[in-house]
Amino acid sequence: MPQSWSVEDIPDQSGRVAIVTGANSGLGLETSVALAGAGARVIMACRNPVKADAALQTVRSRIADADVSLMRLDLASLTSIRDFAHQFLSEHDQLDLLINNAGVMAIPLGRTEDGFEMQIGTNHLGHFALTGLLMNTLQETTGARVVNVASLAHRWTRGLDMDDLNFEDRGYNKWD
């Protein structure tokens, strides 16, 4: 097994469909570039349309023949997640790669439109709901994969209080 791995090692992705959440910057943008460069059809799932359009232009400028498109997705909204899944499923009959990358970190206390604490709602519940809504298509697509991107930030927390995920019974700490 090689000691290192790079974008050049990505096998041909022609004919494969990928969704990348949080594709407007950072790892999501670079993942979109890499997959498009390997021939995948990439759906960049982004919340902010202005940043998403700039990211789309970045991918197209770096990969001349990129098969890439934008779809709006706000993981802090179950309505947006349902709308995204419905639109995707109405336009595609396969999903080879679901890259759950979007996330927020160490933000002030806030709530999703459905009332969940923002970090739990966006980073965990949103991706869980999205994956669940796309699961049938993932299961029907031979060789499909789900990749959940995470960081080492969990090391800075005391752990999840499963009895108070919304910080209703204790003081909010953006690192918890």
Describe each model-derived feature in a short phrase.
Residues 2-176:
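Rossmann-fold NAD(P)H-dependent dehydrogenase/reductase core
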